[in-house]
Swiss-Prot record:
The protein's name: Dermaseptin-H5
One family name in Pfam for this protein: DD_K
Organism from which the protein derives: Pithecopus azureus
Propeptide feature ranges: 18-38, 67-68
Keyword set, alphabetical order: Amidation, Amphibian defense peptide, Antibiotic, Antimicrobial, Cleavage on pair of basic residues, Secreted, Signal
Purpose: Has antibacterial activity against the Gram-negative bacteria E.coli ATCC 11775 (MIC=0.5 uM), and the Gram-positive bacteria S.aureus ATCC 12600 (MIC=0.5 uM) and M.luteus ATCC 49732 (MIC=2.0 uM). Does not inhibit the growth of the fungus C.albicans. Probably acts by disturbing membrane functions with its amphipathic structure.
Predominant subcellular localization, coarse grouping: secreted
InterPro entries: Dermaseptin_dom (IPR022731), Frog_antimicrobial_propeptide (IPR004275), FSAP (IPR016322)
Location of region: Disordered: 19-40
Tissue specificity remark: Expressed by the skin glands.
Amino acid sequence: KSLFLVLFLGMVSLSICEEEKRENEDEEKQEDDEQSEMKRGLWSTIKNVGKEAAIAAGKAVLGSLGEQ
């Protein structure tokens, strides 16, 4: 009987450890996803700012050519 009790408690302990490991992996994956999303948003913002700057520079050049 005591051997079954030891085996049962060992299985329960192992199950709990595996569950905690899965939860930690899920949390790490979620953090990685959030960081990737933030990086994507940052690159999108940088791209939009660059695009607007290029448009403004192009308009300035065309405006100066039109004045000549």
